[in-house]
Protein backbone atom coordinates (compact mmCIF):
# COMPACT_ATOMS: atom_id res chain seq x y z
CA UNK A 1 0.00 0.00 0.00
CA UNK A 2 0.97 3.66 -0.40
CA UNK A 3 1.63 4.26 3.32
CA UNK A 4 4.14 1.41 3.68
CA UNK A 5 5.84 2.34 0.40
CA UNK A 6 6.19 5.95 1.53
CA UNK A 7 7.45 4.84 4.95
CA UNK A 8 10.01 2.52 3.34
CA UNK A 9 11.23 5.23 0.98
CA UNK A 10 11.50 7.75 3.83
CA UNK A 11 13.40 5.24 5.97
CA UNK A 12 15.91 4.59 3.19
CA UNK A 13 16.31 8.34 2.59
CA UNK A 14 16.86 8.88 6.33
CA UNK A 15 19.52 6.15 6.45
CA UNK A 16 21.31 7.64 3.44
CA UNK A 17 21.23 11.13 4.96
CA UNK A 18 22.64 9.78 8.24
CA UNK A 19 25.43 8.00 6.33
CA UNK A 20 26.29 11.25 4.53
CA UNK A 21 26.33 13.32 7.72
CA UNK A 22 28.49 10.74 9.55
CA UNK A 23 30.97 10.12 6.70
CA UNK A 24 29.81 6.51 6.38
CA UNK A 25 30.16 6.80 2.63
CA UNK A 26 32.59 6.06 -0.16
CA UNK A 27 32.94 8.10 -3.32
CA UNK A 28 34.05 6.48 -6.54
CA UNK A 29 35.00 8.57 -9.57
CA UNK A 30 35.55 6.83 -12.90
CA UNK A 31 37.13 8.54 -15.90
CA UNK A 32 35.63 6.79 -18.91
CA UNK A 33 36.32 7.67 -22.52
CA UNK A 34 33.19 9.79 -22.96
CA UNK A 35 31.89 10.38 -19.44
CA UNK A 36 33.29 10.90 -15.96
CA UNK A 37 31.02 9.33 -13.37
CA UNK A 38 30.90 10.02 -9.62
CA UNK A 39 28.93 7.63 -7.40
CA UNK A 40 28.42 7.89 -3.65
CA UNK A 41 27.59 4.69 -1.75
CA UNK A 42 26.64 4.14 1.87
CA UNK A 43 28.35 1.75 4.28
CA UNK A 44 26.22 -1.11 2.94
CA UNK A 45 27.40 -0.37 -0.63
CA UNK A 46 24.04 1.01 -1.74
CA UNK A 47 24.31 3.80 -4.32
CA UNK A 48 22.80 6.94 -2.77
CA UNK A 49 23.82 9.73 -5.16
CA UNK A 50 25.59 10.23 -8.47
CA UNK A 51 26.93 12.83 -10.83
CA UNK A 52 28.50 12.87 -14.26
CA UNK A 53 30.38 15.00 -16.74
CA UNK A 54 30.50 14.46 -20.49
CA UNK A 55 33.88 14.76 -22.15
CA UNK A 56 35.49 13.68 -25.38
CA UNK A 57 39.10 13.18 -26.42
CA UNK A 58 40.45 15.19 -29.34
CA UNK A 59 42.71 14.25 -32.21
CA UNK A 60 45.49 16.85 -32.16
CA UNK A 61 48.78 16.68 -34.04
CA UNK A 62 48.29 12.99 -34.79
CA UNK A 63 47.49 12.06 -31.17
CA UNK A 64 44.26 11.26 -29.31
CA UNK A 65 44.39 13.36 -26.16
CA UNK A 66 42.67 15.14 -23.29
CA UNK A 67 44.26 18.28 -21.84
CA UNK A 68 45.08 18.68 -18.16
CA UNK A 69 42.31 21.31 -18.07
CA UNK A 70 39.90 18.70 -19.48
CA UNK A 71 40.88 16.35 -16.66
CA UNK A 72 40.55 18.98 -13.93
CA UNK A 73 37.28 20.37 -15.30
CA UNK A 74 35.85 16.87 -15.67
CA UNK A 75 36.74 15.93 -12.10
CA UNK A 76 35.21 19.14 -10.78
CA UNK A 77 32.15 18.83 -13.01
CA UNK A 78 31.31 15.26 -12.03
CA UNK A 79 31.82 16.02 -8.34
CA UNK A 80 29.72 19.21 -8.53
CA UNK A 81 26.92 17.25 -10.19
CA UNK A 82 27.11 14.67 -7.38
CA UNK A 83 27.01 17.39 -4.69
CA UNK A 84 23.92 18.84 -6.37
CA UNK A 85 22.28 15.39 -6.39
CA UNK A 86 22.98 14.97 -2.65
CA UNK A 87 21.51 18.39 -1.90
CA UNK A 88 18.39 17.72 -3.97
CA UNK A 89 17.75 14.23 -2.55
CA UNK A 90 18.69 14.69 1.10
CA UNK A 91 18.72 18.44 1.77
CA UNK A 92 22.30 18.40 3.07
CA UNK A 93 25.57 19.73 1.75
CA UNK A 94 28.21 17.10 1.00
CA UNK A 95 31.42 18.38 2.62
CA UNK A 96 33.38 15.15 3.14
CA UNK A 97 33.27 11.43 2.47
CA UNK A 98 34.53 8.40 4.35
CA UNK A 99 36.64 7.05 1.48
CA UNK A 100 37.54 7.97 -2.08
CA UNK A 101 38.53 5.82 -5.02
CA UNK A 102 39.61 6.81 -8.53
CA UNK A 103 39.35 4.65 -11.63
CA UNK A 104 40.50 5.71 -15.06
CA UNK A 105 41.94 4.51 -18.34
CA UNK A 106 44.77 2.18 -17.37
CA UNK A 107 46.75 2.71 -20.56
CA UNK A 108 48.37 5.71 -22.14
CA UNK A 109 51.35 7.96 -21.71
CA UNK A 110 51.80 10.87 -19.31
CA UNK A 111 55.51 11.68 -18.81
CA UNK A 112 56.45 14.42 -16.33
CA UNK A 113 59.65 16.29 -15.55
CA UNK A 114 61.09 16.89 -12.05
CA UNK A 115 58.93 19.99 -11.65
CA UNK A 116 55.74 18.03 -12.34
CA UNK A 117 55.22 19.49 -15.82
CA UNK A 118 53.61 17.23 -18.43
CA UNK A 119 56.22 16.96 -21.19
CA UNK A 120 53.94 15.97 -24.10
CA UNK A 121 50.14 15.92 -24.39
CA UNK A 122 48.51 12.90 -22.74
CA UNK A 123 48.53 10.06 -25.27
CA UNK A 124 45.41 8.01 -24.58
CA UNK A 125 44.81 4.30 -25.03
CA UNK A 126 43.19 5.05 -28.41
CA UNK A 127 46.53 5.82 -30.06
CA UNK A 128 48.01 3.10 -32.23
CA UNK A 129 51.26 4.90 -33.02
CA UNK A 130 53.60 2.50 -31.24
CA UNK A 131 53.68 -0.44 -33.65
CA UNK A 132 57.47 -0.53 -34.00
CA UNK A 133 58.02 -0.41 -30.24
CA UNK A 134 55.34 -3.02 -29.59
CA UNK A 135 56.95 -5.45 -32.06
CA UNK A 136 60.47 -4.92 -30.69
CA UNK A 137 59.29 -5.38 -27.10
CA UNK A 138 57.44 -8.57 -28.09
CA UNK A 139 60.65 -9.89 -29.61
CA UNK A 140 62.70 -8.89 -26.57
CA UNK A 141 60.38 -10.20 -23.86
CA UNK A 142 58.63 -12.97 -25.82
CA UNK A 143 55.42 -11.50 -24.44
CA UNK A 144 52.75 -9.49 -26.23
CA UNK A 145 53.07 -5.76 -25.45
CA UNK A 146 49.97 -4.00 -26.85
CA UNK A 147 50.42 -0.61 -28.50
CA UNK A 148 48.26 1.10 -25.87
CA UNK A 149 50.54 0.13 -22.95
CA UNK A 150 52.61 2.93 -21.46
CA UNK A 151 55.89 1.07 -21.96
CA UNK A 152 55.17 0.87 -25.71
CA UNK A 153 54.59 4.64 -25.79
CA UNK A 154 57.81 5.30 -23.88
CA UNK A 155 59.90 2.99 -26.04
CA UNK A 156 58.38 4.46 -29.23
CA UNK A 157 59.32 7.94 -28.00
CA UNK A 158 62.88 6.67 -27.46
CA UNK A 159 62.97 5.07 -30.94
CA UNK A 160 61.62 8.30 -32.46
CA UNK A 161 64.33 10.32 -30.71
CA UNK A 162 61.70 12.56 -29.12
CA UNK A 163 63.25 15.52 -27.32
CA UNK A 164 61.23 15.16 -24.12
CA UNK A 165 62.61 11.70 -23.22
CA UNK A 166 65.77 13.10 -21.63
CA UNK A 167 63.67 15.18 -19.22
CA UNK A 168 61.39 12.41 -17.93
CA UNK A 169 61.40 12.11 -14.15
CA UNK A 170 58.41 9.77 -14.01
CA UNK A 171 55.45 8.66 -16.07
CA UNK A 172 52.02 7.57 -15.02
CA UNK A 173 48.52 6.72 -16.13
CA UNK A 174 45.50 9.01 -15.97
CA UNK A 175 44.36 7.36 -12.74
CA UNK A 176 47.73 7.93 -11.10
CA UNK A 177 47.75 11.55 -12.30
CA UNK A 178 44.33 12.23 -10.77
CA UNK A 179 45.46 10.58 -7.53
CA UNK A 180 48.55 12.83 -7.43
CA UNK A 181 46.42 15.88 -8.23
CA UNK A 182 44.15 15.11 -5.26
CA UNK A 183 46.71 13.89 -2.71
CA UNK A 184 50.14 15.07 -3.84
CA UNK A 185 51.35 11.45 -3.75
CA UNK A 186 52.68 9.35 -6.62
CA UNK A 187 50.73 6.12 -6.37
CA UNK A 188 49.96 3.50 -9.00
CA UNK A 189 47.29 0.88 -8.39
CA UNK A 190 47.86 -2.74 -9.32
CA UNK A 191 45.41 -2.56 -12.24
CA UNK A 192 47.20 0.44 -13.68
CA UNK A 193 50.59 -1.17 -13.17
CA UNK A 194 49.39 -3.98 -15.44
CA UNK A 195 48.52 -1.39 -18.09
CA UNK A 196 51.89 0.32 -17.94
CA UNK A 197 53.95 -2.80 -18.51
Model-derived features: positions:
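Residue-level structural signal for beta-strand termini and adjacent loop
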Residues: 53, 123-124, 192
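Hydrophobic packing residues within well-ordered alpha-helices of enzyme cores
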Residues: 134-137, 157
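Gly/Ser/Thr-rich active-site cleft segment
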Residues: 31-33, 102, 112, 141-197
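N-terminal glycine/serine-rich phosphate-binding loop of ATP-dependent small-molecule kinases
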Residues: 2-120, 135-136, 165-167
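Conserved donor sugar-nucleotide recognition element shared by glycan-biosynthetic enzymes
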Residues: 68-71, 75, 130, 150-153
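Carbohydrate-associated surface elements
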Residues: 127
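Residues that scaffold the ATP/ADP-binding catalytic core of kinase and kinase-like folds
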Residues: 121, 133, 181
Amino acid sequence: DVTSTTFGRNFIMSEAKTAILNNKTALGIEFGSTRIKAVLVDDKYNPIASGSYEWENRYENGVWTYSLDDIRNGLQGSYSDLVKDVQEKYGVELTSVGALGISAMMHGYMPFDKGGKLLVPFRTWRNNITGEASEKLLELFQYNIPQRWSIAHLYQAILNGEEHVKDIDYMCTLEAYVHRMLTGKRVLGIGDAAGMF
